[in-house]
């Protein structure tokens, strides 16, 4: 992206943007006239005192399409969701950007208009906009009024699968396809599935689905969480992530921060020094750059 992306960010979103960039491992500085400047190897994100936000770098377009627009600029509430009463299936994941903890994929099947009306009555929205207590409360409502399935890939299993696929998008496609196949009615009829487009090409998920027995049609789009069924799936996936990371903390007597920030790296070094590399690999995603940085910088 040769031309910088420029927009004005509402003051209410400044903290959210900074928190999410910290989770992603961006490095922060504060040049003159700025609130902050955050950098990754491929993206520079500068927020000025005026509220002007400037994004540039070779990875800027992907950053904007798959993070900034869907998670920061286009936040929404359930009141703004179009009340589409067509039976459908939504699928979403949680934990793919977190160094510690599992990858969780959830699907929600709203089989009729009554199910959808019940979902619309709740305060369901994209899980990224909710705190943990809200997630846990809404998850109970979703499970009570819909058909659902959740896949939890603990770090040990996740690392095994990543070694098989050698690519996160291929792993995500397999997991999403598996959930869709489990929930899709036979025959699918008018029912369709909606998934966030996590890969640059829609063919990645479609190829994974061809290996399954379902004939359901799938819509992939950026900001799929704006659909209430996908938003419901995102909540169940996040609930599973919260519960599972708590179990891992209790099992290994460690604190596992969310995201991929400097706090995460510090916690990883502590685990490596006190419990060893084997235990560290049981609580984290070992293909992350953070894993190698921790292991290379710590004397065992």
UniProtKB/Swiss-Prot annotation:
Localisation: Cytoplasm
Residue ranges annotated for the RNase H type-2 domain, each copy included: 86-300
One GO location term (cellular component): cytoplasm
Record keyword Metal-binding present: yes
Residues holding a divalent metal cation: 92-93, 196
EC number from the UniProt entry: 3.1.26.4
Keywords for this protein: Cytoplasm, Endonuclease, Hydrolase, Magnesium, Metal-binding, Nuclease
Top-rank taxon: Bacteria
Top EC class of this enzyme: hydrolase
Catalysed reactions, as listed in the record: Endonucleolytic cleavage to 5'-phosphomonoester
Sequence similarity: Belongs to the RNase HII family. RnhC subfamily.
Protein name: Ribonuclease HIII
């Amino acid at each position: 992206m040769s031309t910088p992306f420029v927009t004005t960010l509402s003051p209410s979103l400044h903290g959210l943007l900074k928190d999410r960039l910290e989770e992603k491992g961006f490095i922060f500085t504060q040049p003159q006239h700025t609130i902050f400047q955050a950098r990754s190897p491929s993206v520079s994100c500068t927020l000025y005192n005026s509220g002007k936000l400037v994004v540039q770098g070779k990875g800027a377009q992907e950053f904007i399409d798959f993070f900034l627009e869907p998670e920061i600029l286009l936040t929404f509430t359930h009141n703004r969701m179009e009340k589409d009463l067509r039976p459908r299936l939504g699928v979403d994941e949680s934990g793919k950007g977190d160094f510690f903890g599992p990858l969780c994929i959830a699907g929600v099947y709203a089989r009729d208009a009554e199910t959808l009306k019940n979902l619309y009555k709740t305060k369901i929205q994209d899980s990224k906009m909710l705190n943990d207590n809200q997630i846990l409360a809404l998850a109970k409502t979703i499970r009570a009024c819909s058909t659902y399935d959740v896949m939890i890939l603990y770090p040990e299993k996740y690392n095994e699968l990543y070694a098989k696929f050698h690519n996160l998008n291929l792993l995500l496609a397999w997991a999403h396809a598996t959930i869709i196949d489990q929930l899709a009615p036979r025959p699918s009829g008018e029912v369709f599935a909606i998934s966030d487009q996590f890969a640059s090409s829609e063919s990645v998920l479609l190829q994974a689905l061809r290996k399954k027995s379902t004939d359901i049609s799938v819509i992939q789009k950026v900001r799929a969480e704006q659909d209430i069924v996908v938003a419901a799936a995102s909540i169940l996936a996040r609930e599973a992530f919260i519960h599972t990371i708590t179990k891992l903390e209790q099992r290994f007597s460690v604190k596992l921060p969310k995201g991929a920030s400097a706090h995460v790296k510090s916690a990883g070094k502590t685990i490596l020094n006190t419990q060893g590399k084997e235990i560290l690999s049981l609580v984290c995603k070992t293909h992350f750059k953070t894993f190698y940085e921790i292991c290379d910088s710590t004397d065992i």
